[in-house]
Amino acid sequence: MAVLAEIKKAQEPVEIRFWCDRKFAPQARSIMKNFDPKIPVHTIVAGKFRRYNHMSVARQLLWPSLVLKNLRDMFLVLAGFFQSFVKLIIWRPDVVFTKGGYVCLPVGIAARLLMIPLVIHDSDAHPGLTNRVLGVWAKAIATGAPLKYYSYSANKSVYTGIPISDEFHEFSNRERTEAKKLWKVDVNQPLIVVTGGGLGAQRMNDATAVALQDLLQLGSVVLVSGAGQYDELRSLTPPNSESFQLHPFISKDMASLLGAADVVITRAGATTILELAALKKPTIIVPNGQLTGGHQLKNAAVYMEKDAVKVIDEANMVDNPQILVTTVREVLDDPEAANKMAERFAEFAKPDAARDVADMIISSAR
C-alpha cells in the first residue's frame, strides 16, 4: 500500500490493479476498500512447491500426501500462468510489480513472455524460489536487506529496504497514551502485543493462551490471532476488556496498536519486522523454523546479529510457553537496555523505501 500511495503521488493518472490468490482475497479487498475502493482486486489460481526446512529431502520425497499436493499444484501453476497470460494480454500494463510468493510465479512468467517489464521486491533476507526464478528476467530488483544477503545481479539490484506506510514512526509518550486510549487498554499498564501476521500463527497463539495469566501479571495483552483460530481462542480466553483483547485480524490502525505497545511478540515476517523497526519498538521474534528455506530464521538472524531484537526458538516456546513471560519480563524490567536494543533496531528502518521502490517501478515502465 505504501508503494501504491507513492505511485499515485508521482504518476497521475495511473491505473492500478491488485492481483492475489483466492485465500488472501477477502483481506486484500478489505485493505483496498480502506486505501482506494477504485482499485480492483483480481484473483489468480496458483500452486506452491511445498518444502519444509525441518524435514530431510528424503522424508519429503517419501511423504505421499506432500508429493501428491506438489504434483497437483504444478497444474495449478500452469492454470495460473494461462490465466495471467490472458489477463495481461487484455489489460496490457506498462509494468508488473511482484513481491514474491508462489502467486507471483505464473504472473511473472506471463509478463516475461509478453515482454512486459517486471520489477520485483524481495523482502526476506533469503531469496525464495519464485524470486530466484523471476530475478533472472526482472528489469529491476529491490531488496529488503543489504545486498550481501542476496545473489541477484548487482547491476540491477538496489537495497531499498521494505516499503511501509508513514504511519509507522516512533511514537512520543503522548502519542502512545492516545493510542492506548484508542484501543481501550489500560494507559497505566505496559501493553504487550502478540501478532502472528494476517493469517495468524497457531503455535504462537497456543503458547500465548497457556501463558496468558502470567503475561497479564506484567501488563495488558492484545493478541491478533488470525481468523482461522479465533473461535477456538475466544472460547479459551477472557472477554475483551482494558486488560485483554483478542482480534482475528486488523485491517486498519495496526500502526497505532503497535505504536501503543511497550513490547511486541511477532513472527519474523520481513514487513512486520521493518514496521516495528520504524516504530523503534522493543521486539521479541519467534521465527517459524518450518517454513520453506528457513527464511524466517534467516530474517531473524540479520537482526539478532546486531543485538537489535530478542529471539525465542519456537521449539523451546512449544515445550515451555513460560519463556514468553520470562522474555517479556526481561524487556519490561530493564527499560534502558530495551531502549538501546530498540535504537539498534531502528537503524534498519528505511523511511524512503516506498518512494524508492515506486521510482523503480515508474522508471521501468515501458
Give the predicted meaning of each segment.
Residues D94-V95, G259-L274, K281-P282:
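Acidic donor-binding loop of glycosyltransferase active sites
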Residues V14, K38, R112-T177, V185:
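Active-site-proximal region of nucleotide-activated glycan assembly enzymes
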